[in-house]
């Protein structure tokens, strides 16, 4: 699905997805993979390549800033992803409940075991399946990231900050991710 047709989720739809994931196998993993897109703005391919060592400090705490090397991101531009404190706490709980062998293990692994990471394509298909089963029409692998950027834009965050968070070199690219809605327009005119 192209970005132009990807849907930015409403708060109610985000909750629908969270409710759906809570009722099914691998609930915590699936919830966190989803939250990494809607609360941290990661691309699905970036979620797929995360390792324990990417997010966990040596003392066992979860980083607030995750560095993604150029060879692991789209267009080969390294970037730092910021993880809010709520998501850090959820990730810490997820990591601490498992017996991790080392920092090279995938953060999110398939049903085949802790050494089997999702491929970006398989994870994109997984998101499509979850959205469909949760009753979200037009949900795609881009929906979480588009939701993240649209949500921040609706709170008045500068397009320059959005571009930085998204790892975009051009604000023109970032603008394609933001879905302007009637509520945003209403709030804007009230500022005058």
Where do the language-model regions lie?
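Catalytic phosphate/metal-binding cores of nucleic-acid and nucleotide-processing enzymes, i.e., regions
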Residues: 3, 38, 50, 114-115, ...
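C-terminal catalytic core of Y-nucleophile DNA break-rejoin enzymes
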Residues: 4-5, 73-92, 105-128
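Basic, Lys/Arg- and aromatic-enriched nucleic-acid-binding interface segment
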Residues: 11-40, 44
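Helix-turn-helix DNA-binding elements, focusing on the entry/boundary residues of the two helices
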Residues: 33, 44, 146, 159, ...
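Short alpha-helical segment immediately N-terminal to, or the first helix within
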Residues: 36-37, 151-152, 165
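Active-site-proximal segment of tyrosine recombinases
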Residues: 46-48, 139, 149, 157-168
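Conserved tyrosine-mediated DNA breakage-rejoining catalytic core shared by Y-recombinases
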Residues: 49-78, 82, 87
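Catalytic-site neighborhood detector that most strongly recognizes the C-terminal catalytic loop/helix
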Residues: 68-72, 166-191
């Amino acid at each position: 699905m192209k970005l132009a047709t990807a849907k930015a989720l409403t708060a109610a739809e985000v909750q629908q997805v969270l409710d759906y994931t809570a009722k099914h196998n691998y609930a915590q993993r699936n919830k966190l993979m989803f939250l990494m897109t809607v609360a941290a703005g990661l691309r699905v391919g970036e979620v797929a390549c995360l390792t324990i060592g990417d997010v966990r400090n040596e003392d066992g705490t979860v980083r607030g800033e995750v560095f993604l090397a150029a060879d692991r991101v789209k267009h080969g531009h390294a970037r730092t992803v910021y993880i809010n404190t709520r998501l850090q706490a959820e990730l810490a709980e997820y990591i601490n409940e498992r017996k991790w062998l080392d920092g090279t293990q995938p953060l999110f692994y398939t049903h085949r075991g802790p050494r089997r990471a999702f491929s970006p394509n398989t994870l994109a298909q997984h998101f499509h399946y979850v959205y469909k089963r949760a009753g979200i029409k037009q949900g795609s692998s881009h929906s979480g990231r588009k939701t993240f950027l649209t949500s921040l834009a609706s709170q008045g965050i500068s397009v320059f900050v959005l571009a930085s968070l998204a790892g975009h070199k051009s604000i023109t690219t970032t603008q394609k991710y933001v879905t302007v809605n009637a509520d945003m327009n209403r709030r804007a005119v009230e500022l005058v």
